[in-house]
């Protein structure tokens, strides 16, 4: 089956909904040592009338009627199965430029590089690669993300800091199946034998 990449931010959020296992490598272009790690990313799609979406719009003085919807992102340690820590979460709200939805901005209640509310610009290329550009108070960030399959995606981040230090991160992310999905697979396989 041929992959149909998302071409709007809401399609991207919908395709991303669920839990993802993320393996990350960060390369520092100064004297700092490179880093690597594993985590889970939990994504939940939010409708345009969700109170979290409206709150982010109001905090950033944007008319909530312009929002198409949003998503909540939570990060947690790979082996942590408890409730996500709210300090490792963000709400993103989609504000497309036009009806095509291929370009626009999204509002974040908390930035990725600096933990402050921020507005990012995004666009999708013809082959479905999402590029996000963010200007922070002291840094600039760019993220590119694309799906290789419905259950595997890649993210590349670059950060340019005011002190001249640059870093780059590479993430490969695999969709995790839920316990219910696993039980359904086991039942199907048991029925075949």
Swiss-Prot record:
Enzyme class of the recorded protein, top EC level: lyase
Q: Which Pfam families match?
A: CpeS
Q: Which residues form the signal peptide?
A: none
Its transmembrane ranges are none
Repeat keyword on record: no
E.C. number, please?
4.-.-.-
Keywords from the UniProt entry: Lyase
> What GO MF terms are annotated?
lyase activity
What exactly does this protein do?
A: Covalently attaches a chromophore to Cys residue(s) of phycobiliproteins.
* Similarity annotation: Belongs to the CpcS/CpeS biliprotein lyase family.
Q: What is this protein called?
A: Chromophore lyase CpcS/CpeS 4
């Amino acid at each position: 089956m041929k992959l149909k990449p998302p071409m709007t931010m809401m399609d991207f959020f919908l395709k991303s909904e669920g839990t993802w296992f993320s393996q990350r490598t960060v390369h520092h272009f100064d004297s700092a040592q490179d880093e690597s790690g594993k985590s889970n990313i939990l994504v939940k799609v939010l409708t345009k009338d969700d109170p979290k979406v409206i709150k982010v719009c109001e905090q950033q003085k944007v008319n909530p009627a312009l929002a198409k919807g949003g998503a909540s992102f939570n990060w947690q340690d790979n082996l942590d199965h408890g409730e996500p820590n709210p300090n490792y979460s963000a709400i993103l709200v989609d504000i497309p430029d036009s009806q095509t939805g291929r370009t626009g901005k999204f509002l974040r209640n908390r930035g990725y590089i600096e933990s402050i509310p921020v507005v990012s610009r995004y666009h999708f290329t013809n082959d479905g690669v999402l590029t996000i550009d963010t200007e922070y108070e002291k840094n600039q960030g760019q993220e590119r993300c694309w799906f290789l399959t419905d259950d595997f995606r890649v993210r590349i981040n670059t950060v340019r800091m005011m002190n001249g230090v640059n870093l780059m991160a590479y993430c490969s992310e695999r969709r995790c199946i839920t316990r219910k999905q696993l039980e359904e697979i086991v039942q199907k396989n048991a029925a075949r034998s």
